[in-house]
Design a protein with these regions (language model features):
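Positively charged, helix-rich recognition surfaces that bind polyanionic ligands
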Residues: 1-196
């Protein structure tokens, strides 16, 4: 990818499980759930491998089919990440995102499969690579309280289970992920200003 002309646009990205990403302008990018859609076929293929005798030709064939099914899911996810990252890089000069510790998040067994299916870590590395090639900047923001802090007045008064943010102090009312994206943008601009 060649360096791109400036667009004077910025985007803050809040990665999530309900929607893959929510931008500061309110745009929501829906998650394709590649693994979840293929899960039944993958389980069937895995069962076939388990039922075959070790070392047999039928088992080798079943293992190849299972690997092919997993590869298809991997490529679908990768294709989605490349398309979203390219779109964001083409439209924006600066991209802000949370500095997520996905390895720690995977310890939560209730969310691990969904987090793996979303592939946030892979997406962020693809985004950083494409941005560097295009001469764009990517700023990672500490994720502490981005979803809980009000983007209007800065008050922290809600738990993570609340999906709709309504501030009791200033009256700001919007989706929690949109609120988080606005906070990420504000923090990113502050960090970028301190570096520049």
């Amino acid at each position: 990818m060649q360096p791109l002309p400036p667009t004077s646009q910025e985007a803050a990205i809040d990665l999530g499980l309900e929607s893959f990403a929510t931008l500061a302008d309110g745009t929501r990018i829906h998650i394709p759930r590649c693994y979840r859609k293929a899960e039944r076929a993958l389980k069937t293929a895995q069962r076939r491998v388990s039922r075959r005798k070790t070392g047999s030709n039928r088992r080798r064939k079943a293992v190849k089919l299972l690997a092919k099914a997993h590869l298809k899911v991997k490529r679908q996810r990768q294709d989605f990440h490349h398309k979203v990252a390219l779109q964001l890089v083409l439209l924006n000069d600066t991209l802000y995102h949370e500095e997520l510790q996905t390895a720690n998040m995977l310890k939560n067994h209730h969310l691990a499969k969904s987090i793996q299916d979303a592939g946030w870590s892979q997406f962020l590395s693809i985004l950083s690579f494409k941005a560097a090639c295009a001469g764009r900047s990517v700023v990672a923001v500490p994720p502490a309280y981005t979803s809980q802090t009000c983007s209007g007045c800065g008050v922290v008064k809600k738990g993570l289970s609340v999906r709709w943010h309504t501030c009791p102090d200033c009256g700001t009312s919007l989706h929690r992920d949109h609120n988080a994206a606005l906070n990420i943008e504000r923090l990113g601009q502050r960090l970028r200003g301190a570096v520049a």
